[in-house]
Amino acid sequence: MDPLHVLNKEERWVKVPIRIHKEPIVVKVQATGTTDNPTFLVELDEVDPAIHELIKREICRIFRWDISLHAIHEHFQKTNLKQIFEEHYGTPIVLDFHPYNSLVKCIIHQQLNLKFAFTLTQRFVTTYGIEKNGVWFYPLPETVAKLTVEELRALQFSTRKAEYIIDLSKEIQKGNLHIDSLYEKSDEEIMAELIRYRGIGQWTIQNVLLFGLGRNNLFPLADIGIQNAIKKLLQLEQKPTKEEMEAMLPEWHPYLSYASLYLWRSIE
């Protein structure tokens, strides 16, 4: 579990750090219903009532309350993923709290074991982000753009990763990359735009599309975890080839992102 998340599993709540017009706001979201009849209680900081609708929209986006998990579950009952969808019934895709956070986190996590990746991300956020009511907010791009490679190296970043994150943040600050405009673009347009930046490859973009922007039909074929999950589920002697996985995708379409999530869950 991400150590930056502030939550209570027993009481079923999580505190969500969001920014409206760059202002940090902590929103407490508590599950009060059931898997089949989900309801939620949302508690806000004292904020201007004029932005309540913006906050509501952002929380709905993060938790994907517009998506019917029942319809997705029914879709996979007719596929070879039926077993894992029954075992993990009702598991939603919950998004990273902002696409910029998602991009930075994915760059940090590249080629690291999960434990150290979380540690490094936590160091970065708690050193350069801000804390409010016990909840940490990622630093804004303009803050990161002012950092030096040496400052991130002191946190145990590699030189290249430090350069990638600082350079990306500078491009956002200059207005060359508009993060919020990604919501309106197709997967292909986003791939073509982000691939131009150093340190951002196909794996990173696919993860940002899935967990940063909430696209429903993403399946990272090169992901080792997914390959191992398919091998385990289908009792294969070796990991499936790219061609073998591609042959499975039409059956799972148009919910490939949920196939990805449930395959990951099956090997946790």
Please provide the spans of the model-predicted regions.
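HhH-family (HhH-GPD) DNA N-glycosylase catalytic core used in base-excision repair
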Residues: 1-268
